[in-house]
Amino acid sequence: MRVADFHFDLPEALIARHPLPERRASRLLALDGPTGTLAHRQFADLLDYLRPGDLMVFNNTRVIPARLFGQKESGGKLEVLVERVLDQHRVLAHIRASKAPKPGTRILVEGGGSAEMLQRHDALFELAFAEPVLPLLERVGHMPLPPYIDRPDDAADRERYQTVYAQRAGAVAAPTAGLHFDEALLEAIRAKGVDTAFVTLHVGAGTFQPVRVERIEDHVMHREWLEVGQDVVDAVSACRARGGRVVAVGTTSVRSLESAARDGELKPFSGDTDIFIYPGRPFHVVDALVTNFHLPESTLLMLVSAFAGYPETMAAYAAAVAQGYRFFSYGDAMFITRNPAPRGPED
């Protein structure tokens, strides 16, 4: 399969650069996978697509203010984007500077704080901060908005680039499908008889990296840490027993569940995943999906195409562009039921 098969033209004006005033005010494009039928709704109408007995699985990762500005002790300015917190003081980070720092270089953080560059791991730098890193980031860090939101972060992003159920700090990008849910909607979902469960996948900056090969099969995915607990396994089992559907909120929840079921059976799992889901790959757990609109030629668009079928997905995206839907992290959403016989671009 060619990466170019997943290209579509997106007008710049459809990229959402700010969130709407209310989380649930987004639009919802519903795609019935088996038939390809589309329905244009509001996100609050999601309740109409859920059934008593269903299970919704959310990603409860918490975005950390992972972007720091500062300078080398020698004076050269730099920008740090934390990719992964290793322990209380050490992180792996991307560094943007005119000249890459060498081991032993001391970095002075704008707003207070310092770190030492310990060693380089390919594209990432291992840094040791003089004080506990998470409180430091909360104090002087900036929210790591995606590269397509071409503006500085502001105070509102601290709240809105975060789900209302975020708990476990470690992500450097939001699980954006979850941004549409407020407490009232979650309460209404539970009141309808829909169960909820939470996985954790700390979304890395690699989620925004373009696919740099021509053929999908040659792409190597970035690694991200996730955890699927026994409680989630039990909730899925109970859902299956009562005839309900597993509804994943976001592609990160899909990747978590399917990573924990690579041999066909869902089991507790904690560790790194590099799962790459593209057309032709089976789904063992997820029956329906809530997701935002993704970048052209991205691995997430490939995942959606594997779930709903390639022709159905690309037709839905064409309709979304024609109808002026808002795209990407702060944009609108889709509700998709799985296509039992999805076709790829070459079928």
UniProtKB/Swiss-Prot annotation:
Domain of life assignment: Bacteria
Statement: the UniProt record of this protein carries the keyword S-adenosyl-L-methionine: yes
Gene Ontology biological process terms in this record: queuosine biosynthetic process; tRNA wobble guanine modification
Pathway: tRNA modification; tRNA-queuosine biosynthesis
Main location class: cytoplasm
Subunit text: Monomer.
GO molecular function: S-adenosylmethionine:tRNA ribosyltransferase-isomerase activity
UniProt catalytic activity: 7-aminomethyl-7-carbaguanosine(34) in tRNA + S-adenosyl-L-methionine = epoxyqueuosine(34) in tRNA + adenine + L-methionine + 2 H(+)
EC category: transferase
NCBIfam families referenced in this protein's UniProt entry, alphabetically: PRK00147.1, queA
The protein's role, per its UniProt record: Transfers and isomerizes the ribose moiety from AdoMet to the 7-aminomethyl group of 7-deazaguanine (preQ1-tRNA) to give epoxyqueuosine (oQ-tRNA).
Pfam families given in the database record: Queuosine_synth
Subcellular location(s) of the protein: Cytoplasm
E.C. code: 2.4.99.17
Lineage per the UniProt record: Bacteria, Pseudomonadati, Pseudomonadota, Gammaproteobacteria, Pseudomonadales
Name of the protein: S-adenosylmethionine:tRNA ribosyltransferase-isomerase
Keyword Transferase: yes
Family of this protein: Belongs to the QueA family.
A cellular component term, taken from the record's GO annotations: cytoplasm
This protein's UniProt keywords: Cytoplasm, Queuosine biosynthesis, S-adenosyl-L-methionine, Transferase
